[in-house]
Amino acid sequence: MRENRPVIALDFPTLEDVKAFLAKFPADEKLYVKIGMELYYAAGPEIVRYVKELGHSVFLDLKLHDIPNTVKSAMRVLSNLGVDMTNVHAAGGVEMMKAAREGLGDGPILIAVTQLTSTSEEQMRDFQNIQTTLQESVVHYAQKTAEAGLDGVVCSAHEVAKIKEATNQDFVCLTPGIRPAGAAVGDQKRVMTPADAHQIGSDYIVVGRPITQAEDPVAAYHDIKAQWNDQ
Protein backbone atom coordinates (compact mmCIF):
# COMPACT_ATOMS: atom_id res chain seq x y z
CA MET A 1 0.00 0.00 0.00
CA ARG A 2 3.04 2.23 -0.31
CA GLU A 3 2.49 5.72 -1.77
CA ASN A 4 5.35 6.86 -4.02
CA ARG A 5 4.53 10.56 -3.62
CA PRO A 6 5.69 12.37 -0.48
CA VAL A 7 2.69 13.95 1.23
CA ILE A 8 3.21 17.72 1.29
CA ALA A 9 2.10 19.41 4.51
CA LEU A 10 0.28 22.58 3.42
CA ASP A 11 1.09 24.50 6.58
CA PHE A 12 -0.24 27.82 5.31
CA PRO A 13 -2.64 30.21 7.07
CA THR A 14 -4.94 31.00 4.12
CA LEU A 15 -6.48 29.54 0.99
CA GLU A 16 -4.75 32.22 -1.07
CA ASP A 17 -1.36 31.03 0.17
CA VAL A 18 -2.26 27.49 -0.87
CA LYS A 19 -3.36 28.64 -4.31
CA ALA A 20 -0.07 30.48 -4.80
CA PHE A 21 1.95 27.46 -3.71
CA LEU A 22 0.09 24.90 -5.83
CA ALA A 23 0.29 27.19 -8.86
CA LYS A 24 4.05 26.62 -8.90
CA PHE A 25 3.50 23.00 -9.98
CA PRO A 26 2.56 21.89 -13.51
CA ALA A 27 -1.19 21.35 -13.86
CA ASP A 28 -0.69 17.69 -14.78
CA GLU A 29 1.38 16.92 -11.67
CA LYS A 30 -1.02 15.43 -9.16
CA LEU A 31 0.17 15.79 -5.59
CA TYR A 32 -0.74 14.24 -2.26
CA VAL A 33 -1.18 17.01 0.29
CA LYS A 34 -1.91 17.26 4.00
CA ILE A 35 -4.39 19.84 5.25
CA GLY A 36 -3.99 20.41 8.96
CA MET A 37 -5.87 22.23 11.69
CA GLU A 38 -4.64 25.77 11.03
CA LEU A 39 -5.57 25.77 7.36
CA TYR A 40 -8.84 23.89 7.78
CA TYR A 41 -10.01 26.11 10.62
CA ALA A 42 -9.08 29.21 8.62
CA ALA A 43 -10.49 28.22 5.23
CA GLY A 44 -13.07 25.58 6.13
CA PRO A 45 -14.32 22.78 3.85
CA GLU A 46 -13.69 25.00 0.81
CA ILE A 47 -9.98 24.26 1.03
CA VAL A 48 -10.61 20.53 0.63
CA ARG A 49 -12.97 21.08 -2.27
CA TYR A 50 -10.50 23.39 -4.00
CA VAL A 51 -7.59 20.95 -3.74
CA LYS A 52 -9.73 18.00 -4.85
CA GLU A 53 -11.00 19.96 -7.87
CA LEU A 54 -7.37 20.31 -8.97
CA GLY A 55 -7.08 16.52 -8.92
CA HIS A 56 -4.81 16.22 -5.89
CA SER A 57 -5.17 13.65 -3.10
CA VAL A 58 -5.97 14.95 0.38
CA PHE A 59 -4.96 13.78 3.84
CA LEU A 60 -7.14 15.79 6.23
CA ASP A 61 -5.18 15.86 9.46
CA LEU A 62 -7.65 16.90 12.18
CA LYS A 63 -6.82 14.21 14.78
CA LEU A 64 -10.39 13.82 16.02
CA HIS A 65 -10.73 12.89 19.69
CA ASP A 66 -14.20 13.00 21.25
CA ILE A 67 -17.03 10.72 22.32
CA PRO A 68 -17.83 7.97 19.77
CA ASN A 69 -21.10 9.41 18.48
CA THR A 70 -19.62 12.86 17.89
CA VAL A 71 -16.64 11.42 16.03
CA LYS A 72 -18.90 9.18 13.94
CA SER A 73 -21.01 12.16 12.86
CA ALA A 74 -17.95 14.27 12.09
CA MET A 75 -16.45 11.49 9.99
CA ARG A 76 -19.64 11.24 7.96
CA VAL A 77 -19.23 14.92 7.06
CA LEU A 78 -15.57 14.42 6.12
CA SER A 79 -16.48 11.45 3.93
CA ASN A 80 -18.85 13.68 1.96
CA LEU A 81 -15.94 16.06 1.30
CA GLY A 82 -14.13 13.31 -0.59
CA VAL A 83 -10.98 13.17 1.54
CA ASP A 84 -8.58 10.36 0.68
CA MET A 85 -7.26 9.95 4.21
CA THR A 86 -8.02 11.29 7.67
CA ASN A 87 -7.22 10.47 11.27
CA VAL A 88 -8.20 10.24 14.92
CA HIS A 89 -6.30 10.02 18.20
CA ALA A 90 -5.85 6.38 19.25
CA ALA A 91 -6.08 7.58 22.87
CA GLY A 92 -9.81 8.09 22.25
CA GLY A 93 -10.25 4.35 22.61
CA VAL A 94 -11.32 1.36 20.55
CA GLU A 95 -15.03 2.24 20.60
CA MET A 96 -14.33 5.75 19.36
CA MET A 97 -12.13 4.41 16.56
CA LYS A 98 -14.79 1.89 15.54
CA ALA A 99 -17.34 4.70 15.42
CA ALA A 100 -14.97 6.75 13.26
CA ARG A 101 -14.63 3.86 10.82
CA GLU A 102 -18.39 3.46 10.63
CA GLY A 103 -18.94 7.16 10.02
CA LEU A 104 -16.24 7.49 7.39
CA GLY A 105 -17.12 4.36 5.46
CA ASP A 106 -14.76 1.98 3.69
CA GLY A 107 -13.40 4.24 0.95
CA PRO A 108 -10.97 6.68 2.57
CA ILE A 109 -7.93 5.54 4.53
CA LEU A 110 -8.44 5.99 8.28
CA ILE A 111 -5.42 6.08 10.55
CA ALA A 112 -4.78 6.92 14.19
CA VAL A 113 -2.21 9.09 15.93
CA THR A 114 -0.14 7.12 18.44
CA GLN A 115 2.36 9.50 20.04
CA LEU A 116 3.10 12.83 18.38
CA THR A 117 6.58 13.05 16.88
CA SER A 118 7.15 16.10 19.08
CA THR A 119 6.76 13.92 22.19
CA SER A 120 9.89 12.72 23.94
CA GLU A 121 10.00 9.72 26.26
CA GLU A 122 10.58 12.05 29.21
CA GLN A 123 7.50 14.11 28.32
CA MET A 124 5.41 10.97 27.91
CA ARG A 125 6.37 9.72 31.36
CA ASP A 126 6.19 13.03 33.21
CA PHE A 127 3.06 14.50 31.64
CA GLN A 128 1.05 11.51 30.38
CA ASN A 129 2.15 9.32 33.32
CA ILE A 130 2.81 6.41 30.94
CA GLN A 131 5.59 4.38 32.47
CA THR A 132 6.47 2.15 29.52
CA THR A 133 9.00 3.07 26.86
CA LEU A 134 7.87 5.37 24.07
CA GLN A 135 8.12 2.55 21.54
CA GLU A 136 6.04 0.22 23.72
CA SER A 137 3.35 2.89 24.02
CA VAL A 138 3.27 3.44 20.26
CA VAL A 139 3.07 -0.29 19.50
CA HIS A 140 0.26 -0.72 22.05
CA TYR A 141 -1.75 2.06 20.42
CA ALA A 142 -1.10 0.51 17.00
CA GLN A 143 -2.41 -2.87 18.13
CA LYS A 144 -5.58 -1.25 19.48
CA THR A 145 -5.96 0.68 16.23
CA ALA A 146 -5.79 -2.55 14.23
CA GLU A 147 -8.27 -4.14 16.64
CA ALA A 148 -10.69 -1.29 15.92
CA GLY A 149 -10.52 -1.97 12.17
CA LEU A 150 -8.55 1.10 11.10
CA ASP A 151 -6.03 1.02 8.27
CA GLY A 152 -2.92 2.16 10.11
CA VAL A 153 -1.24 4.75 12.28
CA VAL A 154 0.77 7.93 12.25
CA CYS A 155 4.14 7.06 13.74
CA SER A 156 7.81 7.86 13.72
CA ALA A 157 9.84 5.81 11.27
CA HIS A 158 11.71 4.49 14.31
CA GLU A 159 8.63 2.43 15.24
CA VAL A 160 7.59 1.12 11.81
CA ALA A 161 9.25 -2.30 12.00
CA LYS A 162 7.88 -3.06 15.47
CA ILE A 163 4.39 -1.90 14.49
CA LYS A 164 4.23 -4.07 11.38
CA GLU A 165 5.57 -7.01 13.38
CA ALA A 166 2.85 -6.48 16.03
CA THR A 167 0.02 -6.00 13.49
CA ASN A 168 0.64 -7.05 9.87
CA GLN A 169 2.75 -5.97 6.92
CA ASP A 170 -0.22 -4.30 5.20
CA PHE A 171 -0.91 -2.07 8.22
CA VAL A 172 -0.27 1.49 7.03
CA CYS A 173 2.52 3.46 8.68
CA LEU A 174 2.47 7.17 7.85
CA THR A 175 5.60 8.95 8.99
CA PRO A 176 5.86 12.69 9.68
CA GLY A 177 9.03 14.37 10.87
CA ILE A 178 10.83 13.63 7.59
CA ARG A 179 13.73 15.92 6.73
CA PRO A 180 16.27 15.69 3.90
CA ALA A 181 19.83 15.15 5.09
CA GLY A 182 21.21 18.38 6.53
CA ALA A 183 17.83 20.09 6.98
CA ALA A 184 16.81 21.73 10.27
CA VAL A 185 14.68 19.46 12.46
CA GLY A 186 12.37 22.25 13.68
CA ASP A 187 9.98 21.15 16.45
CA GLN A 188 10.18 17.45 15.63
CA LYS A 189 12.01 15.32 18.20
CA ARG A 190 12.21 12.11 16.19
CA VAL A 191 13.20 12.61 12.56
CA MET A 192 14.51 10.59 9.60
CA THR A 193 15.46 11.24 6.00
CA PRO A 194 13.24 10.09 3.10
CA ALA A 195 15.76 7.38 2.21
CA ASP A 196 15.81 6.16 5.83
CA ALA A 197 12.01 5.96 5.86
CA HIS A 198 12.04 4.00 2.60
CA GLN A 199 14.55 1.50 3.93
CA ILE A 200 12.67 1.04 7.20
CA GLY A 201 9.33 0.35 5.51
CA SER A 202 7.17 3.47 5.94
CA ASP A 203 4.17 3.53 3.58
CA TYR A 204 3.66 7.31 3.51
CA ILE A 205 5.93 10.18 4.49
CA VAL A 206 4.90 13.74 5.30
CA VAL A 207 7.21 16.62 4.42
CA GLY A 208 6.41 20.27 5.05
CA ARG A 209 8.88 23.12 5.36
CA PRO A 210 11.71 21.52 3.34
CA ILE A 211 9.32 21.78 0.37
CA THR A 212 6.96 24.66 1.17
CA GLN A 213 9.72 27.02 2.32
CA ALA A 214 12.28 25.99 -0.29
CA GLU A 215 13.58 28.57 -2.76
CA ASP A 216 12.35 26.24 -5.52
CA PRO A 217 9.53 24.11 -4.06
CA VAL A 218 9.05 22.06 -7.23
CA ALA A 219 12.73 21.08 -7.38
CA ALA A 220 12.75 20.35 -3.64
CA TYR A 221 9.67 18.14 -4.03
CA HIS A 222 11.19 16.15 -6.88
CA ASP A 223 14.46 15.73 -4.99
CA ILE A 224 12.67 14.42 -1.89
CA LYS A 225 10.44 12.21 -4.05
CA ALA A 226 13.55 10.68 -5.63
CA GLN A 227 15.09 10.06 -2.20
CA TRP A 228 11.84 8.51 -0.99
CA ASN A 229 11.76 6.17 -3.98
CA ASP A 230 15.45 5.33 -3.51
CA GLN A 231 16.42 6.71 -6.92
Curated annotation (Swiss-Prot):
**Record keyword Metal-binding present:** no
Which positions in this protein are listed as binding substrate? 11, 34, 61-70, 117, 179, 188, 208-209
Look up the coiled coil feature and give its residue ranges.
none
| Pathway note | Pyrimidine metabolism; UMP biosynthesis via de novo pathway; UMP from orotate: step 2/2
| Gene3D superfamilies from the UniProt entry | Aldolase class I (3.20.20.70)
What keywords are assigned to this protein? Decarboxylase, Lyase, Pyrimidine biosynthesis
Q: Which Pfam family, an example, fits this chain?
A: OMPdecase
Any one GO BP annotation for this protein: 'de novo' pyrimidine nucleobase biosynthetic process
The entry's active site is: 63
Enzymatic class? lyase
What reaction(s) does this enzyme catalyze?
orotidine 5'-phosphate + H(+) = UMP + CO2
Its cellular-component GO annotations read: cytosol
**Which cysteines does the record link by disulfide bonds?**
none
**Alphabetical list of HAMAP family matching this protein:** OMPdecase_type1_B
Protein purpose: Catalyzes the decarboxylation of orotidine 5'-monophosphate (OMP) to uridine 5'-monophosphate (UMP).
UniProt lists the family membership as follows: Belongs to the OMP decarboxylase family. Type 1 subfamily.
Query: What is this protein called in UniProt?
Result: Orotidine 5'-phosphate decarboxylase
